[in-house]
Amino acid sequence: MSTAPSNNRLNRQQAESFLSSLSGHYYPNSSREFISGSNKDIQVPFRRIHLSETLHQPTPGVKLPPNEPVDVYDTSSVYGDPDATIDVKAGLKKVRENWIQERHSENQQYNHGITQLAYARRGVITPEMEFIALRENMGRGHLKNPITPEFVRDEVASGRAIIPVNTHHPESEPMIIGRNFLVKVNANIGNSSVSSSIEEEVEKLVWATRWGADTVMDLSTGRNIHQTREWILRNSPVPIGTVPIYQALERVNGVAEDLSWPVFKDVLLEQAEQGVDYFTIHAGVLHDFIKLTAKRVTGIVSRGGSIMAKWCMAHQQESFLYQHFRDICKICAKYDVSLSLGDGLRPGSIADANDEAQFAELRVLGELTQIAWEYDVQVMIEGPGHVPMHKIQENMDEQLKHCHGAPFYTLGPLTTDIAPGYDHITSCIGAAMIGAFGCAMLCYVTPKEHLGLPNKEDVKQGMIAYKIAAHAADLAKGHPGAQARDDAMSKARFEFRWEDQFNLALDPVTARSYHDETLPQDSNKTAQFCSMCGPKFCSMKISHEVRQYNPDTRIDVKVKDAATEGAE
């Protein structure tokens, strides 16, 4: 007898319990702070990690100055505020409502385009752009090369960056996706015909934003797609993306050949009205490209790509997505929905990486990008997939060559095919590499990839792996301020400030639990060793002793501001 129904009921009950008792998450020794903009409506959230004093002074009798707190980018909104009252039935505060209404009155008078790209091209710095500049800098006014609102505007105007902010999703806190900004991470959630419920997907949304998701895609293919998306949007502080062809397929009872432009158009309008911030559109899958996949090991692995390929073959013509692309752009322009041009022919195995089908589609995506820009629609380009390490840079080079600087957004890529259950690791290797080469956003992969629908714990594992990859890429790019947290951690580690080490970690709970498995006593939180080396073999403790023995080896242990270092 199958246990699936009972497991599904249990998962739903657990999710309902989580949401009914939902309160802001407490990060150890952290506080939620705000940076004010030029008007009172611009309040940029961030998390401040407070640090303790240095316990073991390098020079007897000489007290070092206090360790400054570390400010970090925060996507958790009220879900990271222990003092917040949260009601998922009421939804989040509409932080952008006033900005949208003010612009609506102006646009009615002058008949201007309403997208962030349209404003940027007119030389207008929107509140969203100012918000983003403050957010990227984390209030570090002393940076050598800080991000300015004008820089944000110029990057958007050039098409090198996008601000996905549907005017019908006022709950979202503005963020930017572009190669000259912090590398962002997307988390995929969504139900299937086999598993999950609305409650579970909202739970995953909350969980993903707590662990740092910059955007979330609702890839629901099961029941209640509209209702699931509505709950997600009203409770999401981050941009929400979708693949509209999934809901369109549901409308025609799963028969790809019965899809049509009228059906798809209705879905686009419905989702845009709800507030979806970006659409993945697989308009680059052309009829002639399908035969290029015939000799692939894994064929067409994109769900949207395979659906459109089947439609093209059945009707022996180009897809309605390609034929009606300008109509799609007109809808997006009305709501400021960004386009994520899907890589329907991405490689699904190492053997298929960088093949003719993949790059043929990429060139078409570059052509579609220019068409979208004619309508002031913001665009990013989706990328692979499964790519071995030595072929990753070619993907970035080809995207820059053919897509006119539009941001690149990749799924990994996975660097080997041999590790089911660990594909969050195989893929974050490739993600870190392509992020360092200039990829703007990384789509996370969970341990369940190729195996099943991710649960809440899988979402966490995927997010942690990809926040590591994104941060490593930011360090490699020399992003202003990126190294501040690393240097604070290194200093805490050298000074045996264990509590600070836990609190500075991406996952403080796990860091603490690993330490406490062998040294749980409070006294061990000030000890000059851990269980790896013990008191006699700790290299850092010995290094302190060397400095005491030989004054010439003493150095100023005050860490230089890594924010300035990263900008040089």
Curated annotation (Swiss-Prot):
GO MF terms held by the record: 4 iron, 4 sulfur cluster binding; carbon-carbon lyase activity; zinc ion binding
Cellular component, GO annotation: cytosol
Cofactor note: Binds 1 [4Fe-4S] cluster per subunit. The cluster is coordinated with 3 cysteines and an exchangeable S-adenosyl-L-methionine.
Binding annotation for Zn(2+): 386, 450
Superkingdom field: Bacteria
Pathways per UniProt: Cofactor biosynthesis; thiamine diphosphate biosynthesis
The keyword Mitochondrion appears for this protein: no
Catalytic reaction annotation: 5-amino-1-(5-phospho-beta-D-ribosyl)imidazole + S-adenosyl-L-methionine = 4-amino-2-methyl-5-(phosphooxymethyl)pyrimidine + CO + 5'-deoxyadenosine + formate + L-methionine + 3 H(+)
Residues holding [4Fe-4S] cluster: 530, 533, 538
Uppermost EC category: lyase
Entries under InterPro entries matching the protein: ThiC, ThiC-associated_dom, ThiC/Bza_core_dom, ThiC/BzaA/B
A GO biological process held by the record: thiamine diphosphate biosynthetic process
Binding-site positions, substrate: 188, 217, 246, 282, 302-304, 343-346, 382, 409
Gene3D superfamilies: 6.10.250.620, Radical SAM ThiC family, central domain
Keywords: 4Fe-4S, Iron, Iron-sulfur, Lyase, Metal-binding, S-adenosyl-L-methionine, Thiamine biosynthesis, Zinc
Cofactor(s) the protein needs: [4Fe-4S] cluster
EC number: 4.1.99.17
Assembly notes: Homodimer.
Family, per entry: Belongs to the ThiC family.
Protein task: Catalyzes the synthesis of the hydroxymethylpyrimidine phosphate (HMP-P) moiety of thiamine from aminoimidazole ribotide (AIR) in a radical S-adenosyl-L-methionine (SAM)-dependent reaction.
Record's protein name: Phosphomethylpyrimidine synthase
